[in-house]
A protein has these predicted regions:
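Short, solvent-exposed secondary-structure boundary motifs
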Residues: 7-8, 12, 23, 76-79, ...
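Detector for small/aliphatic-rich hydrophobic stretches
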Residues: 2, 6, 32-184, 192, ...
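Non-catalytic, conformational "gating/processing" segments within enzyme and secreted inhibitor domains
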Residues: 83, 122-304, 316-402
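Structural recognition of the beta-strand scaffold that forms the well-ordered cores
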Residues: 95-98, 290-292, 416, 427
Length: 436
């Protein structure tokens, strides 16, 4: 029996593990009505859970914790860095923190565990992460995914053999030795590593002046690059130059892609009754989809929708949206973001690892004063008609009017790429001006 598909995942008829039938919902808290469960069904469900041998609930919890971390990290980065256009890969950051957790002890370990919601030494966590990474990086000719993390550690630091073994086993991670006293050489080493792990698209990520001296240091670096083809391609000949209303109210002309397809679509509202729409656009293979979220009212700020985002709301959207044939308009855009995670992670409760007096990494080395001096994250995403770089020719086509429903992302929106099987948010970002 596949323990990752146990009872707690639910069934297509909408019956929950407690015999509940969902009859209504909001975007955050589904409303359920409870009916008596037939005795035979109760025992069958109980037997199924026993077969799972405790894996059902841990796996569901891990899915939710992964999503919750993604949401909170995104919200912190958007607010602490005051970003307009941004993209991050929460999955990449989480794996980097997981690698650090192997070597952390004391309150440093506790802070990472509390923020991630799990302990990497737990066997179920290791199995879940390994399975998720294997599926995620199973690239084909239509999909390219590069996920990697590295710890750059001061040369001469005696590294624990056990930690080195953890590094080799943990999600395309590596341990790199460097000399932080040679600032420029360290920057070149990190930049070269990043360039190799972002499809060759990043030449400069750090500068030599970012590194201090006086303590033994660790630089935590994580990257993720994603490029794939749509399940239903946008027709390049249908791409038009259309107006997009940016955050400040100004209008810019952007290349707006178009497709007519059967997509999952839903209309929701926040607890304060601000309405928004969500559309799901799958990539080839149906393992990853892009969810595009846009306020319904032009006067509703995107931040009011983002601030109410939770892991439960994302699960609700994915489970309750309905298939409908409609016209989709989505701007062509490419985002590339660099993030210094120190402020965002500290705001999430992970602060000791950045303090040379409090950081405890005795699991990495018995060397004192070992701390994280840099936490660097790079993410890139490119959204185009067919998933490959478009040529320089722009076709101007006036689309015929249609009576079908229309979803037009002609105002600021946020998006996230979600892996269907694990529910993990691979990327999350916002677009306020597609031309940036």
């Amino acid at each position: 029996m596949d323990v990752s598909k146990c009872l707690a995942e639910g069934d297509p008829q909408g019956v929950t593990s407690r015999g509940q039938h969902r009859t209504a919902h909001t975007d955050r808290f589904p409303v359920v009505h409870t009916y008596p469960m037939p005795p035979v069904l109760f025992w069958l469900l109980l037997y199924s859970c026993c077969l799972c041998q405790g894996h059902c609930h841990p796996y569901d919890r891990l899915r939710e914790q992964n999503t919750e971390f993604a949401v909170k990290l995104y919200q912190k980065i958007v607010t602490t860095e005051n970003r307009t256009d941004v993209v991050i890969s929460p999955s990449s950051v989480a794996r980097s923190l997981g690698l650090l957790q192997f070597g952390a002890q004391g309150s440093t370990f506790t802070q990472i565990e509390k923020t991630l919601g799990y302990n990497v030494f737990d066997k179920s966590v290791k199995i879940f992460m390994k399975s998720m990474h294997r599926e995620l990086t199973n690239s084909s000719q239509d999909t390219s995914i590069c996920l990697a993390c590295a710890l750059f550690v001061q040369a001469g630091t005696p590294i624990s053999t056990q930690f080195t073994e953890y590094t080799v086993q943990w999600a395309n991670s590596s341990l790199q030795l460097t000399n932080f006293t040679e600032h420029n050489r360290t920057a070149i080493q990190i930049n070269q590593w990043v360039n190799r792990n972002t499809g060759g698209g990043t030449e400069t990520m750090v500068a030599g002046g970012q590194f201090g001296s006086g303590f033994m240091q660790i630089a935590l670096v994580s990257t993720m690059y994603f490029k794939s083809k749509w399940k239903t391609k946008f027709s390049f000949t249908d791409t038009q130059t259309l107006p997009f209303i940016s955050t400040d109210g100004s209008v810019v002309k952007v290349p707006m892609m178009h497709q007519t397809a059967d997509v999952a679509y839903g209309q929701f509202e926040t607890p304060s009754h601000e309405k928004f729409t969500v559309v799901e656009l799958p990539y080839l293979g149906n393992t990853v989809s892009m969810f595009v979220v846009r306020p319904t009212d032009r006067n509703t700020p995107l931040s009011s929708i983002e601030s109410n985002l939770t892991s439960k709301s994302i699960t609700t959207w994915a489970n309750t949206m309905k298939k409908i044939k409609m016209d989709i308009f989505l701007p062509r855009f490419k985002l590339e973001s660099y993030s210094d995670l120190r402020m965002a992670l500290s705001a999430l409760g992970i602060s000791d690892l950045f303090d040379p007096r409090k950081a405890d990494f005795k699991g990495i080395s018995e060397q004192k004063n070992l701390y994280v001096s840099q936490a660097i994250h790079k993410a890139q995403i490119e959204v185009e008609e067919g998933g490959t770089r478009a040529s320089g020719v722009t076709a101007m086509v006036l689309l015929k009017r249609s009576r079908m429903p229309v979803f037009k992302a002609d105002r600021p929106f946020f998006f996230f790429l979600r892996q269907a099987s694990s529910g993990s948010v691979l990327f999350i970002g916002r677009v306020t001006n597609p031309l940036h």
